Every structure is written in structure tokens, then in C-alpha cells.
């Protein structure tokens, strides 16, 4: 093999290390610099290069050269073992409060009460799909967790979903790995983004999704539960943890997401999913990540 070096920032170094390990290069060489986030810079011009980029990169050029020229050690040359598609099962017995405390301590929720994912509850959730429980829907970045149907169902139970919501969650997980989404960028950014899930087609009415007034407010069970389930999936399968992968400076009040349906029946436009070649009778999930907010006052 040939030496490779990743240039990273000190405040996201741990995230970079964990990401490299997840991609089977645990001994990747790193060089830390002080370059700040340039996501919102309008253009890469001479002033930016001279005033911001050069002062951060020039001091570490020698380290970069050394990392690229220094021969690999035997440890770095070794091929890492790739774990099989298995995950440890854990059984915990206790009161509802004890279960919630245990899950919170393990980092499996954000502290709000969950529905315990008992074997019976997960089996009931799996009745919402024809997929086998061990079917891998996707490998979710940043940590490339294998999102099996069973794992998705576990998080759906925890979030308070009904089995009829499971097809929406499976479709959303498939969408998460679309290159257009660039999930790593949104989940691991230093900026705060909010996941947005919009649903089209007959399934909106089948599951009772709110598509009208207060559709963003989370009063309605399907809207709130689906958004929370996807947030838990991002934590527990994607492996996105605060300060480890999610490096947002201030975060976002809607970080755990919003879910709503398009009000197709009262909209002056054709349903959004038809713009992508789908039929109006098809059900579809659209994913996006929002940073800015808009205020709508009066009227519809």
C-alpha cells in the first residue's frame, strides 16, 4: 500500500478517526490544522486563499510531506478484519423507568421516554413489511451501520410507531444513502441542520399523516413518530453522536426532524413526486436537510 494523509481540524479529529475506522482504514495518518469551516464562503478568491487558507495550511506542510513519504509500518500495512453482518443482542429487564434510563446511558435515545423494544413489540412491528428481518436495507454513514429491517423496526418501536409506518421508514432509509443526500455532510457538519421528511401518495391518508394546518408542529402521531424514528435510526444505526460525529456548534432545535405530507388535494401544483417520474398513485418519501427558516403569516 501507499501512505495517505487526511488533513483535518482539531475539533473534528475524533470524528475523522472514527470515520476512518468504519471504512476499514483504522491506521490512516492525520495532520491537524486550524482551518475553519468554509461552507458558507461565497467564493474561493485570492483574498480567502491568502488571508485564511495559507495561514492554516502552510504551518503543517512539512507534516503532510512526512506523512506521505514515511514508509508504512507493519501495523499500517495489515489488512483489517471486516466484521460479519452481525450485531450483539442485549437483554435488559427492569421497570419502564429503568429501561429508559438504561437506554439513555447507553446513548440509544435523547432522554425522552421510549417504548421498550421487546421481542413481541418488534415482531408486531415487522408485520408492516414483507421484507425478512435480516434484510440489509442500506449501510448508513457516517459509521456505515447496517440498517437491517429488524434494526429499523427496533427504532420504530422505540419512537412509538405503528407497523403501518414501517414502509415509510424503510423507504426513507433507502433514500438516505442516495449520493444526492450526502448524509455525512449533513450529520457531521459544524453547522446545525434539521432533517425534513415529506411524504406523497396514498400512504399519507392510509396512515393518517397530517398534511394541512400545523403540519410541522408535531401534534399528530404519524408525523411525530416517523420523524423521531428516523432521528433514532440516525443515532443508533448511522452512528451519529454529539461531539463525536455531529460537530454542530449550536445545533438546531429541529435536529430530531419533522415529517409531513404534501396537501396534494388542495395544492395548485402537481404532487412533488411526479416531478421525478412517479405516478400520482405512487407513494413516495422525499428527504432534505434544512438550515434556514421561513415564516408564513396568514392565508394558505
Question: Which positions does each model-derived feature cover?
Answer:
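Short, surface-exposed basic-aromatic patches at helix termini and helix-loop junctions that form
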Residues: 1-2, 21-25, 278
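Long, charge-dense
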Residues: 29-42
Amino acid at each position: 500500500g501507499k501512505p495517505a494523509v487526511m488533513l483535518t481540524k482539531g475539533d473534528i479529529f475524533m470524528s475523522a478517526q472514527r470515520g476512518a475506522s468504519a471504512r476499514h482504514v483504522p491506521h490512516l495518518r492525520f495532520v491537524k490544522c486550524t482551518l475553519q469551516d468554509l461552507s458558507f464562503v461565497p467564493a474561493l478568491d485570492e483574498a480567502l486563499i491568502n488571508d485564511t487558507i495559507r495561514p492554516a495550511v502552510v504551518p503543517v506542510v512539512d507534516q503532510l510531506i512526512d506523512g506521505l513519504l514515511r514508509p508504512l509500518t507493519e501495523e499500517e500495512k495489515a489488512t483489517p478484519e471486516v466484521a460479519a453482518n452481525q450485531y450483539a443482542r442485549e437483554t435488559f429487564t427492569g421497570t419502564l423507568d429503568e429501561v429508559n434510563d438504561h437506554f439513555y446511558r447507553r446513548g440509544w435515545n435523547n432522554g425522552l421516554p421510549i417504548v421498550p423494544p421487546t421481542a413481541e413489540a418488534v415482531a408486531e412491528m415487522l408485520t408492516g413489511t414483507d421484507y425478512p428481518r435480516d434484510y440489509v436495507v442500506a449501510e448508513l454513514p457516517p459509521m456505515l451501520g447496517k440498517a437491517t429491517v429488524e434494526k429499523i423496526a427496533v427504532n420504530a418501536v422505540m419512537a412509538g410507531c405503528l407497523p403501518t409506518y414501517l414502509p415509510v421508514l424503510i423507504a426513507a432509509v433507502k433514500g438516505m444513502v442516495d449520493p444526492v443526500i450526502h448524509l455525512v455532510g449533513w450529520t457531521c457538519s459544524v453547522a446545525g441542520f434539521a432533517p425534513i421528511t415529506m411524504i406523497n401518495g396514498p400512504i399519507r391518508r392510509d396512515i393518517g399523516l397530517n398534511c394541512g394546518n400545523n403540519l410541522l408542529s408535531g401534534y399528530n402521531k404519524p408525523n411525530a413518530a416517523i420523524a423521531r424514528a428516523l432521528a433514532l435510526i440516525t443515532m443508533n444505526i448511522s452512528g451519529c453522536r454529539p461531539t463525536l460525529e455531529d460537530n454542530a456548534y449550536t445545533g438546531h432545535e429541529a435536529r430530531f426532524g419533522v415529517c409531513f405530507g404534501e396537501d396534494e388535494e388542495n395544492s395548485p401544483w402537481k404532487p412533488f413526486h411526479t416531478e421525478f417520474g412517479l405516478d400520482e398513485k405512487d407513494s413516495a418519501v422525499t428527504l432534505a436537510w434544512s438550515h434556514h427558516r421561513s415564516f408564513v403569516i396568514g392565508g394558505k
